[in-house]
UniProtKB/Swiss-Prot annotation:
May function in the formation of membrane-bound replication complexes or in the assembly of the virus. InterPro entries: Corona_7 (IPR003449). GO terms for cellular component: host cell membrane; membrane. It is found in: Host membrane. It is a single-pass membrane protein. Belongs to the coronaviruses ns7/ns7a protein family. The keyword Zinc does not apply. The keyword rRNA-binding does not apply. It comes from Feline enteric coronavirus (strain 79-1683). This is Non-structural 7a protein. It comes from the Viruses. Keywords: Host membrane, Membrane, Signal, Transmembrane, Transmembrane helix. Its main location: host cell.
Length: 101
C-alpha cells in the first residue's frame, strides 16, 4: 500500500511539473515572437524615433537557433514526463486492482 501511495504522489508531482514546463514553453514562444518582431521592425529602413529607440533594445546577437533548441528540448521533456506519468498511472491502477482482489 505504501508503494501505491508513493506512485500516486509521484504522478501528482509529475503533473505539476508538466504544467510548469508548459508555462516555460509559452514564455519561450512569447520571447521568440518579441525578438522576431523587434528584428523585423529594425530591418525596415526608417529614421523615425521609434526605430531609433528600438535599436537601443536590440541585443548584440539575436540567436534564434538557441531559442528554437531550448523550445524543442522543453517539448521533448514534456513528452518524456507524460510517458513516465502514464507508466506510473498504469502501475498505480495495477497495484490498486491487485490490492482489491
Amino acid at each position: 500500500m505504501l508503494v501505491f501511495l508513493h506512485a500516486v504522489l509521484v504522478t501528482a508531482l509529475i503533473l505539476l511539473l508538466i504544467g510548469r514546463i508548459q508555462l516555460l514553453e509559452r514564455l519561450l514562444l512569447s520571447h521568440l515572437l518579441n525578438l522576431t518582431t523587434v528584428s523585423n521592425v529594425l530591418g525596415v529602413p526608417d529614421s523615425s524615433l521609434r526605430v531609433n529607440c528600438l535599436q537601443l533594445l536590440k541585443p548584440d546577437c539575436l540567436d534564434f537557433n538557441i531559442l528554437h533548441k531550448v523550445l524543442a528540448e522543453t517539448r521533448l521533456l514534456v513528452v518524456v514526463l507524460r510517458v513516465i506519468f502514464l507508466v506510473l498511472l498504469g502501475f498505480s491502477c495495477y497495484t490498486l486492482l491487485g490490492a482489491l482482489f
